[in-house]
């Protein structure tokens, strides 16, 4: 099965009717199950895309999506920030009606109740195989915080997803590792991860103490543990073999998304893909560095468009 049918948001909403207040029956004919991919990008404005009139940067792959589907010029979001906007999308609920839906630290517990009937649950009930790839920022693990050295549960697999390859929070927050199906990718058990958002742990340098080690200037509290020359929000130590390389994050997201698509090309699938771009820190791959002529923000817009192009292929 390799159906690609552009959909408007209105065609998805009925699946979420009732969301967390019950288990709606979903009945979809076999011949009406197109593959569905949600692409969630942070900090991307309407003026950043050429399909919306941007003239100094070209986004041909996103433009093709706009030409084939529905381009919105008047829309509303439940929130303008990471965690609550994702919570609203996946649950169909207003985030301000529940506690703990503010921007989550990187060691937060899973903030969506596994008893909640999510969008992923609805898709799963309709016969779709479901996957989540990329930025998550909805917490992982039990109340009390996440232990990144063991299998993490509950996680995305407990709220409707069959597969996950996740950035636990954001790229500007520790821990700077990927999690695949509850396990930190590439973790050496002899170098366990410790994460804290209240005080420094370990002896890794920080942006506030060692600014000479930075390749990007810290701002807005981004002056804690330094990873890859970038100071993050929060402190971590350990997990050296599992640390991501910022310049390669977009490539990893594109790879894992396309691998999921290839594995399930003969069955209906639902893929939720959260990109790292164009959120800070903006660290484009060398293929895109300096290419936009608009600084790193312009470069990562090009990188985002490339990522979407890879998925569309």
Task: Name each model-derived stretch.
Residues 1-10:
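Bacterial N-terminal signal peptides that target proteins for export
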Residues 14, 19-313:
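Formylglycine-dependent sulfatase
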């Amino acid at each position: 099965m390799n159906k690609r049918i552009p959909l408007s948001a209105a065609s998805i909403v009925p699946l979420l009717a009732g969301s967390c207040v019950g288990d709606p029956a979903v009945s979809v004919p076999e011949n009406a199950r197109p593959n569905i991919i949600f692409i969630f990008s942070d900090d991307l404005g309407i003026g950043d895309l050429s399909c919306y009139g941007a003239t100094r940067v070209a986004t041909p792959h996103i433009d093709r999506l706009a030409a084939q589907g529905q381009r919105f010029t008047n829309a509303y979001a439940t929130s303008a920030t990471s965690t609550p906007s994702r919570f609203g999308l996946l649950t169909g609920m207003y985030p301000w009606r529940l506690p703990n839906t503010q921007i989550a630290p990187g060691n937060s517990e899973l903030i969506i109740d596994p008893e909640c009937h999510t969008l992923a649950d609805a898709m799963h009930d309709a016969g779709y195989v479901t996957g989540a790839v990329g930025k998550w920022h909805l917490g992982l693990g039990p109340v009390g915080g996440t232990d990144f050295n063991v299998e993490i549960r509950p996680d995305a697999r407990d709220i409707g997803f069959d597969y996950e390859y996740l950035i636990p929070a954001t790229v500007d927050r520790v821990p700077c590792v990927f999690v695949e199906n509850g396990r930190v990718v590439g973790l050496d058990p002899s170098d366990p991860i410790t994460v804290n958002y209240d005080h420094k742990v370990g002896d890794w340098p920080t942006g506030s103490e060692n600014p000479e080690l930075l390749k990007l200037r810290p701002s807005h509290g981004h002056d804690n543990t330094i990873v890859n020359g970038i100071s993050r929000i929060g402190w971590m130590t350990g997990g050296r073999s599992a640390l991501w390389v910022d310049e390669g994050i977009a490539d990893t997201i594109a790879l894992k998304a396309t691998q999921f698509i290839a594995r399930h090309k003969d069955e209906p699938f639902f893929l939720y893909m959260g990109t790292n771009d164009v959120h800070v820190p903006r660290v484009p791959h060398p293929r895109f560095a300096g290419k936009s002529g608009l600084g790193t923000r312009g470069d990562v817009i090009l990188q985002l468009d490339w990522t979407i192009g890879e998925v569309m292929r």
